Curated annotation (Swiss-Prot):
One of its GO terms (molecular function) is magnesium ion binding. Homooctamer; tetramer of dimers. Substrate binds at H23, R49, E339. It comes from the Bacteria. It catalyses: L-rhamnonate = 2-dehydro-3-deoxy-L-rhamnonate + H2O. PANTHER family: ENOLASE SUPERFAMILY, MANDELATE RACEMASE, MITOCHONDRIAL ENOLASE SUPERFAMILY MEMBER 1. This is L-rhamnonate dehydratase. CDD domains: MR_like_2. It holds the Pfam family MR_MLE_C. Keywords: Lyase, Magnesium, Metal-binding. Belongs to the mandelate racemase/muconate lactonizing enzyme family. RhamD subfamily.
Length: 395
């Protein structure tokens, strides 16, 4: 261990348009259609999520260089705010440390930012640093990240697809399809009727054995979510996802008691750290946890979240995040399948989530991915040199 390199530099960049901020898409993309959101109570912000600024956060690229010249990197969301946090605050805990000091660095970053952090943009940033550290260490050791996490427990990953066309996802070999909920409580009975009509139409198209789920993106209240779940049981809705605001643990516990027997309640995309997920688990808020590894605290924290979930008999199915979640899921028994975000504008083909920003990003084939597709050192991806990185706060 004494010959392990130290960390020489950490640098933070952003990039304009798309990248890791997958909401930053052009017009006509399904992800910016009329989708139910917490802002749906305001008619002027109902038609497009970009209208209220869902795409303003931007991409954060964290690059960490070791004393032997090895470079690890990651991409997440955070933009210029994340760059400022890395360069002005977190760099002091990273530079000069050993590449193996991942746990210590995480602890220092989290505790040093408690007075203005805990969740949100700060945890996105800490997650980005953490992922870059895992990428760096794995490259130094010339191993894939999943080898550092204990190695694969299965030969392949199995995926469900998130997008506007579950019927097409079935033809592509996915085990299920998760639809965005289009109409929230502010659109009243007519909106609820349209939600159920779409679900019924998709059930007709895909048959009885294909999973269908609704992603509600924090936009409902307990009453509406309960009504939706009960009515949707006719169409064999497998789960209702992120129905309530992430801080409403009490509401989630009530909703889980209310939904029809056999239907699952899932959440956690916008939760962070082991302490947030501890609340979800101990209050019996959900059946599946869905942390985003680029937002919840990185791999270091996701390992703790997963252990907590396993002790409570719950599954962990990370939100999106491509290779950053694939390397984790392949090593965990309580993560039996993965999410794949359909980033084609019409959700009609399989394209890499971070295209064109990352090169060598693997994608499912017929809804599956061999473990061997993840065997390159680190997370196995490269930054596209054609993406113009900007470093707003150089030191």
């Amino acid at each position: 261990m004494n010959n392990m390199p130290t960390i020489k530099h950490v640098r933070a960049f952003t990039v304009r348009g798309g990248g890791a901020d997958y909401h930053d898409q052009g017009s006509g993309h399904w992800i910016d259609d009329h989708i139910s959101t917490p802002m749906g109570r305001y008619p002027e912000y109902r038609q497009s999520r970009q209208s209220f600024g869902i795409n303003v956060l931007g991409t954060l690229v964290v690059e960490i260089e070791a004393s032997d010249g090895t470079v690890g990197f990651s991409v997440t969301t955070g933009g210029e705010l994340g760059c400022w946090i890395v360069e002005k605050h977190l760099a002091r805990f990273i530079e000069g440390a050993k590449v193996t000091d991942i746990e210590k660095i995480w602890d220092q970053m989290f505790n040093a930012t408690l007075y203005y952090g805990r969740k949100g943009i700060v945890l996105n940033t800490i997650s980005g640093v953490d992922l870059a550290l895992w990428d760096l260490l794995a490259k130094v050791r010339k191993e894939p990240v999943h080898a550092l996490l204990g190695g694969p427990v299965r030969d392949e990953l199995t995926f469900y697809a998130t997008g506007a066309r579950p019927d097409l996802a079935k033809k592509m070999g996915f085990i299920g399809g998760k639809l965005p909920l289009h109409h929230g409580p502010a659109e009243r009975e007519e909106g609820l009727k349209k939600n159920l009509e779409l679900l019924g139409e998709m059930r007709q198209r895909v048959g009885d054995d294909f999973w269908l789920m609704y992603d509600c993106w924090m936009s409902l209240d307990v009453e509406y979510a309960t009504r939706l779940a009960n009515a949707a049981s006719e169409y064999k809705l497998k789960w209702i996802e992120e129905a309530l605001p992430p801080d409403d643990y009490w509401g989630y516990a009530e909703l889980r008691r209310n939904v029809p027997r056999g239907m699952l309640v899932t959440t956690g995309e916008h939760e962070a750290t082991r302490w947030g997920f501890r609340m979800l688990l101990e209050m019996e808020c959900c059946d599946i946890l869905q942390p985003d590894v680029g937002w919840c605290g990185g791999i270091t924290e996701l390992l703790k979240i997963s252990a907590l979930a396993d002790a409570h008999g719950k599954l962990v199915v990370p939100h999106g995040s491509s290779v950053y979640s694939y390397h984790f899921v392949i090593t965990r028994h309580n993560s039996p399948f993965s999410e794949f975000l359909m980033m084609a504008p019409k959700a009609d083909e399989v394209v890499p989530m971070f295209n064109p920003m990352l090169l060598d990003e693997p994608v499912p084939v017929n809804g599956r991915m061999k473990a061997s597709a993840l065997d390159a050192p680190g997370f196995g991806v490269r930054l596209n040199p054609e993406c113009a990185l900007q470093r707003p706060f150089p030191r």
